[in-house]
Amino acid sequence: MEPDVGGSNPPSCTKLMNKKIFKPRSEWPAGFVDRQEEELLARDLLISNIKKVMAKYGFQYLETPSFEFTDSIGKFLPDKDRPSEGVFSFEDDKKWLSLRYDLTAPLARYAAKNFNNLPRPFKRYQLGTVWRNEKPGPGRFREFLQFDADYIGTSNLFADAELCCLISEILSTCGLTKKEFIIKISNRKLTKGLLEKLKINDENKQSIVLRAIDKLDRVGLEGVQYLLGKGRKDKSGDFTKGAELDESQIKDIINFLSIKDLSDNNFEKIEKIAGDNQTILDGVNELILIKKYFSLLKFDNFKFDPTVVRGLEYYTGPIFEANLTFGVTNNKGEEIEFGSIGGGGRYDDLVRRFNNQDCPSTGISVGLDRLIYAILQKNKIKVEKESPILICVFDEKYMDYYVKILNLLRTKDISAEIYSGTANIKSQLKYADKRGCNYVILCGDDEVSNNSVTIKNLEIGKQMSNSLKDRDDWKESSGSQKTVAFDQLLNEIK
């Protein structure tokens, strides 16, 4: 529509002047974050180490879409009647789509779709971004990079044991010692059998109980008791509805959670709790077998912990969780225990949902951004960052000479750039300092006419500036810069 420039009622200038100009916010949404180069380089190094470990263990690389049909994963959402609860979803052409909240549900869909063509067991690993519509916290984001490794199509518990060894090896490549992480193991059949024995048959109530147990490290024993009962209000005032169990049921669950290792005495305690419940007894026998495989694999950095239940509902057997045992500093400057960076377990029924085919499977996941957050705080990973050489611009008329230097450096795979802008040399040197440049190249009338370059070592310059007493000392000292012939440039900066 064309503006009316000749009408008798022009728009009011006062109204136009008073109209507020919209300014979008420069903040990110809660649970999302910009990631800087240091973190991204650490991520690249970690991914490189992961790929080496996965090749050694014989896993194949796979990638699945970021979006899935919500009904493919909806059964496992916190509330399947509210597609946006727990995940980010939208309706497209009368069908609900959701951003994947993990990499396991998409893998199950992939395995069902390609069931007849895949070797079984199918050993795959994947690296990809996932999204959770949940309350964020320190090192816990709504968008994060996740790593998964899975066995599809095997009931052999050696696969479960090997996954624990695999994660342990990956954490070791991050510079973590055995004292700085632990693999906790349990079995979903123990809690499933306990729910059967206590006659907690309502599926929704079962889910609340499992999520309550899973939160023990975060909310404490008293918090779990509230979540098993009427419910719990957190520090922000948000209320989480509880399972509304009776006091006897709550007491039995708390007693079960007090068992802390896989000693013969504790196996007997669990069997006593089980009575004639075969589900619990099966879970105990599976843990005994996994413990045997750990011994064969010479893996001892694990412990039994019945509070490990894993929040997702598709687990059916052995489950495991990788925990960091050291503390980190949160945004308030407080020292907190970091806790879980990943976990997994056996999910024998997940593929069957799609094709009604028996396909026992097991897998493990690690939140890489959460792991990187921790290891960077502890300086556990050293990232080699190549700083560029800055070619300063004295005069635009010498641009051909500057480009000649640039081409020489880049043909030798040396990071270099010509300053882009109109700032003076002092400002260009400040720019180089902010970029972390170790060298700058200075070329004015003398250098161009003599086919030479002046190389300034900023690192040496910083050291000298701390020891020089006055301006005269600085002028007399030439240790931080050197003029050489053009063909000697590469020799000087190597």
Where are these regions (language model features)?
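Phosphate-rich ligand and nucleic-acid binding surfaces
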Residues: D34, R188-K189, G193-I200, K251
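Short secondary-structure boundary/capping segments
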Residues: P78-K80, K197-N201, K456-N457
